[in-house]
Design a protein with these regions (language model features):
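Bacterial N-terminal signal peptides that target proteins for export
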Residues: 5-18
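Conserved alpha-helical scaffold segments that buttress catalytic/binding sites
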Residues: 35-333
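Bacterial N-terminal signal peptides
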Residues: 17-28
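Boundary at the C-terminal end of the N-terminal hydrophobic targeting segment
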Residues: 29-33
Length: 333
């Protein structure tokens, strides 16, 4: 009886050994056929290939991080925005050449597009002017390669050196809770005054400001916006009249640059920012806005700014911003 049981156990052991061996042999093929889990590998935006040498750049989209928050008047932490955006972009990471599939509409967008992450600009804390020169130089190189720049901030002061790199006529579409036309820094560049400088750039022909709200926009900032001739559409007006109120304010343009401050969104949706205001635009409102902007002209660049992960451990601010970015690009390309 013991011999029979021993023989059966031996046969079972042999079968298990064979099965394990087959699994081991199959693992390389299985692994090669699968997308790696999101927790595997070096973090790049959407797991795009990493290409830090801008002289070798050859892509449709180049993602550039600007980890700078020396221009903020609110809670610092935006310097970690690029890292947070890259981390939370892993939720959407896959083979980017396959594009993005929308189940609503049963459609695939941005298929065949080549993305690269070119890393971060080397910033110099407490030396904003030198940092600004580095930002402008990097964006100029991207543009020279006929590649679309996607800039990850950073506080909103980085938008000035980014736009300074362009030499084509631009309409700047500024989505924000704040006008950013305040001159309280006595002429110095910061995240609340960058519009004053952008308006003086030769390439900038029109500035449209969308989503402003709350009690942090003082009469001086409002007066400066009027003096500059910017077109302002508040969040209240968008709530009341619909997204068409914002789209109608954007003129037909040869080229459009979008700067997206995440504090334009309702803080219940996007708490991860340094200077949020109660209220704000809903996801549906901003998403429709993003989808409609390219109907007014050629999209030539964009930035996502004021992401502060210290105020949003959940990461939903960054993930929402990424989704809105994809929807904007899908509408444009």
């Amino acid at each position: 009886m013991e011999r029979v049981e021993a023989g059966g156990a031996m046969r079972n052991l042999t079968a298990v050994t064979v099965l394990v061996g087959l699994i081991i042999l199959a693992l390389p093929a299985f692994a090669g056929a699968q997308t790696a889990p999101t927790f595997v590998g070096v973090r790049t935006f959407l797991s795009a290939p990493y290409e830090p040498d801008l002289d070798k750049l050859h892509a449709d989209f180049a993602v550039l991080g600007v980890p700078f928050d020396e221009g903020t008047w609110g809670q610092p932490g935006e310097r970690y925005g690029p890292r947070d955006l890259r981390e939370n972009s892993q939720e959407y990471a896959h083979d980017l050449t396959e594009g993005f599939y929308y189940i609503d509409g049963d459609r695939t967008v941005l298929k065949g597009k080549h993305w690269v992450d070119v890393g971060d600009v080397i910033v110099y804390p407490t030396v904003p002017a030198e940092t600004g020169e580095k930002i402008t130089a990097a964006v100029k190189k991207i543009l020279a390669k006929k590649t679309f720049p996607i800039i990850l901030g950073g506080d909103h002061s980085i938008t000035f050196p980014v736009i300074r790199a362009f030499d084509v006529p631009l309409t700047v579409v500024h989505i924000d809770a704040h006008l950013d036309t305040w001159n309280g820094a006595k002429g110095n560049l910061d995240h609340a005054s960058w519009v004053l400088r952008v308006a003086k750039l030769p390439a900038v022909k029109k500035i449209v400001q969308l989503g402003m709200r709350g009690i942090a926009n003082d009469p001086e900032a409002a007066g400066n916006a009027k003096a500059l001739g910017t077109k302002v559409v508040t969040s209240e007006e968008i709530h009341r009249r619909g997204v068409s109120a914002a789209i109608d304010a954007i003129p037909r343009s040869e080229n459009i640059y979008v700067t997206f401050d995440v504090d334009s969104m309702d803080p219940a949706l996007a708490p991860g920012t340094g200077t949020y205001e109660p209220g704000g635009l809903s996801f549906a409102e901003i998403d429709e806005l993003m989808k409609q902007i390219p109907t007014k002209g050629k999209l030539v660049g964009l930035d996502i700014v004021e992401v502060n992960p210290y105020r949003d451990p959940s990461g939903r601010t960054a993930q929402t911003a990424i989704r809105l970015m994809v929807d904007l690009l899908a509408a444009a390309f």
